[in-house]
Design a protein with these regions (language model features):
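Catalytic-site microenvironment of enzymes
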Residues: 1-177
Length: 177
């Protein structure tokens, strides 16, 4: 477990935020595989705000990095599966698009099935090592598009059929305050 006060260097967060101080051990023993949706040749959903073209993968990546950093601060082991060595966490109102993202250093295939298989293979290989060292291992996939015109939200839960707790969590109804 990472000790409180330990500093971790993660260049993917960018120059200003690459230094991550562990402030809690609340997630000690936990390991997360954080995957931002799309990336590389696939920008995901594309929209416009005025003259600014918005690409889903850029916002999903930024959110994934912020989540990964927060998990690390809480003492978790974190693997960032989709990576862009240049972008880092950005505070710009509009994030520019790039196709530099890789799957842990490997080019992301254009074919959707190959892209998904690549991510699964990376996570499964890491999990085979991590399962011996961590009591809790989970993959988190982040997408930010929405197809609902009314509420503009989509929430999907995928769960293991073998675990009752997993199914219970997926069935929790999320209501507006």
């Amino acid at each position: 477990a990472k000790k409180i006060g330990t500093t971790i260097n993660e260049p993917l967060f960018g120059k200003k935020l690459s230094s991550v101080k562990v402030t809690s051990n609340r997630l000690a023993g936990a390991c997360f595989y954080v995957v931002s949706g799309h990336g590389g040749p696939d920008p995901g959903a594309i929209g416009w705000v005025g003259k600014h073209e918005l690409h889903e993968d850029e916002y999903a990546y930024d959110i994934a990095l912020r989540l990964a950093r927060n998990l690390m601060q809480e003492g978790a082991e974190v693997h960032i599966i989709i990576q862009d060595a240049k972008d880092g966490i950005r505070d710009d109102a509009y994030l520019s698009n790039s196709k530099r993202e890789t799957c842990m250093g490997d080019p992301i295939p254009l074919n959707q099935v190959q892209r998904l298989q690549q991510r699964c293979n990376k996570i499964n290989a890491l999990y085979q090592k991590d399962r011996k060292n961590y009591t809790y291992c989970r993959a988190i996939f982040i997408h930010v598009d929405s197809r609902s015109k009314g509420k503009q939200t989509d929430v999907f839960f995928y769960h293991s059929n073998k675990k009752a707790e997993s199914k219970r969590l997926s069935l929790i109804h999320i209501s507006e305050p």
